[in-house]
From Swiss-Prot:
Residues 29-87 form the 4Fe-4S domain. The keyword Ion transport does not apply. It comes from Haemophilus influenzae (strain ATCC 51907 / DSM 11121 / KW20 / Rd). The complex is composed of six subunits: RnfA, RnfB, RnfC, RnfD, RnfE and RnfG. GO terms for molecular function: 4 iron, 4 sulfur cluster binding; electron transfer activity; metal ion binding. It is an enzyme of class 7 (translocase). Residues 1-23 are annotated as: Hydrophobic. The lineage of its organism: Bacteria, Pseudomonadati, Pseudomonadota, Gammaproteobacteria, Pasteurellales. The gene is rnfB. GO terms for biological process: electron transport chain. InterPro entries: 4Fe-4S_dom (IPR007202), 4Fe4S_Fe-S-bd (IPR017896), 4Fe4S_Fe_S_CS (IPR017900), Elect_transpt_cplx_RnfB/RsxB (IPR010207), RnfB/RsxB_Proteobac (IPR016463), RnfB_subfamily (IPR050294). This is Ion-translocating oxidoreductase complex subunit B. Its cofactor is [4Fe-4S] cluster.
Length: 193
């Protein structure tokens, strides 16, 4: 029994040393500029830039693609990327400011299929199989990736109207989103406390 323990321990040490050596010898060096740009991007993996995630978009930027495609990152991200690359910040003339939207699930039509939950890159949708789902407005980036997979078309994208109360002041403030119920009554959803 002791002999078996010693043999297994020696094998574990030998294989551990081989793996440690291989990880150092076969290490692939990443482009540090790509890593810096990827760290600045919002990591929502929403695909609004035309790439499947933030890392591929960072690589495309280093290969000469436009730096203005990240909608969730906004102007601040564009300025930071321009600083890293040492280029001028492109003018935003002719480029419309995207309308900020939040997904809303009509809970009377939701069948609980969980397809929207699987599609959401930021886990802004909560619910379980065969039960109603709902959206957490603070987490929703408005990427619309949850709309297409929904078989009952119960997900609507509602524009968030900017006013003095819900504008992004960069400090803890309440976000009020007007929500129209199915019965026609209107209520206000307060988030961000």
């Amino acid at each position: 029994m002791t002999f078996l323990f010693i043999v297994i321990t020696l094998l574990a040490l030998i294989f551990g040393a081989i793996l440690g050596f291989a990880s150092i010898k076969l290490k692939v060096e990443a482009d540090p500029v790509v890593e810096k740009i990827d760290a600045i991007l919002p990591q929502s993996q929403c695909g609004q830039c035309g790439y499947p995630g933030c890392k591929p978009y960072a690589e495309a930027i280093c290969n000469g693609d436009e730096i203005t495609k990240c909608i969730p990152g906004g102007q601040t991200t564009i300025v930071k990327i321009a600083e890293i690359l040492g280029v001028d910040v492109p003018t935003m003339e002719g480029i419309e400011e995207p309308i900020e939207k939040v997904a809303f699930i009509d809970e009377n039509m939701c069948i609980g299929c969980t397809k929207c939950i699987q599609a959401c890159p930021v886990d802004a949708i909560i619910g379980t199989n065969k039960a109603m789902h709902t959206i957490i407005p603070d987490l929703c980036t408005g990427c619309e990736l949850c709309v297409a997979p929904c078989p009952t078309d119960c997900i609507l994208m509602i524009p968030v109207k900017k006013n003095i109360d819900n504008w992004d002041w960069k400090f803890d403030a309440k976000l009020v989103i007007p929500v129209m119920n199915v019965d026609g009554s209107e209520k206000k959803l307060v988030v961000g406390e």
